[in-house]
Regions:
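Kelch-like beta-propeller repeat domains
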Residues: 29-340
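Bacterial N-terminal signal peptides that target proteins for export
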Residues: 1-6
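C-terminal motif of bacterial Sec signal peptides marking the signal peptidase cleavage site
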Residues: 15-17
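Bacterial signal peptide processing site
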Residues: 19-21
Length: 340
């Protein structure tokens, strides 16, 4: 298994910083990507990839899952249908980690922003969209940050929301931006302290975005709500300070779920296997008979058709990347792929 190194919450890749802002091309780049037929294939071991539900494909898409940063390969997207994984793209923009991605339900496109390409030496400020057939690089002026960003789709505004990250000089940024398919717009530079490895999900029932935890100046348990273009901090006693965890919103039961993560800045020695649920303003620790192992940075998403929370991968206390798939059915965790 591939091993990784984290100091604090920053990844140690190389001495090179982020690149300067990506030059704006005169014409968009268009890359055909759709495989002729779905290819049944398990994703590689990876951590902190995005797991996003695509309503047209009726799949949970695993985005920014990179196994070997020494290889220069195009970005691959895998889809989970509840029984098996399939590779749904072949070809596309360069693979990357720690970028932001979101699915725009109104326009039916997957959005990809920033991240570190797999040479790990530079980050970029590219904006790409995938319409299910082709990737198109958008000709736009980008946000300030270039990686360690998080994105969600805000159905109320019809725009995708991006928060935090590192700028090209590797300064932490606490700006909030929106993407409408044509341009990026800065909405705020106040609110939560800049951070990395936090939870960021959309709550459609209350038309708001939820931010929990992460590593700011230290591991935090802050809870923030983005609604009506403004941040508000709220407090619900619960999991405590946490970073590198998985978080997903169950739209069927209107509940927020958190799994795994690190409870201190000593990331690998402080991993947990706890499952928490927040419903109606109250946190509760669940006690299932079976559970995924202790891990950091698992991918976590919700399938609204099958009404299942899905967890994929992450890393363990020995710094090994993981490749198992688990589902939460509302009562228990069940391992469905690469079980040990």
């Amino acid at each position: 298994m591939r091993k990784i190194l984290i100091v604090g919450w920053f990844l140690i890749f190389s001495t090179a910083g982020c690149s300067s802002a990506t030059p704006i091309a005169s014409t968009p780049t268009i890359l055909p990507t759709l495989a002729p037929t779905p290819i049944l294939e398990n994703p590689p071991p990876c951590w902190e990839a995005d797991l996003i539900y695509h309503s047209q494909l009726q799949l949970l898409l695993l985005v920014n899952c990179v196994e070997d940063p020494s290889k220069e390969t195009p970005l691959t997207i895998w889809g989970w249908d509840g029984m098996q994984w399939q590779r749904v793209t072949q070809g596309g923009p360069p693979a990357r980690i720690l970028g932001g991605s979101a699915y725009d339900e109104k326009r039916n496109v997957l959005i990809l922003y920033g991240g570190r390409p797999i040479d790990l030496g530079k980050c970029n400020q590219e904006t790409w969209e995938w319409d299910g057939k082709t990737w198109t690089q958008k000709v736009v002026t980008p946000p300030t940050a270039c990686d360690h960003v998080k994105m969600v789709y805000d159905a109320a505004s019809g725009e995708s929301i991006l928060f935090s990250g590192l700028d090209p000089s590797e300064n932490l940024i606490n700006e909030t931006w929106s993407w409408n398919g044509e341009e990026w717009k800065k909405l705020s530079d106040t609110g939560p302290e800049s951070r990395g490895h936090f939870g960021f999900v959309y709550d459609p029932g209350h038309e708001q975005t939820l931010l929990y935890g992460g590593y700011a100046s230290t591991v935090t348990d802050e809870f923030w709500v983005w609604k009506d273009n403004a941040w508000q901090e709220v407090y619900f006693p619960g999991p405590g300070p946490l970073s590198h965890f998985g978080m997903a919103y169950d739209t069927d039961s209107n509940a927020l779920y958190i799994f795994g993560g690190a409870i201190s800045s000593s990331t690998f020695s402080s991993l947990t296997d706890k499952t928490w649920i927040l419903r109606e303003g109250s946190w509760r620790e669940l006690a299932p008979e079976n559970s995924p192992s202790r891990r950091g940075a698992p991918s976590m998403g919700f399938d609204p058709i099958r009404k299942r929370i899905v967890v994929y991968g992450g890393f363990d206390s020995n710094r090994n990347n993981l490749a198992d798939t688990w589902e939460w059915d509302g009562q228990q965790w069940v391992c469905l792929s690469n079980c040990k």
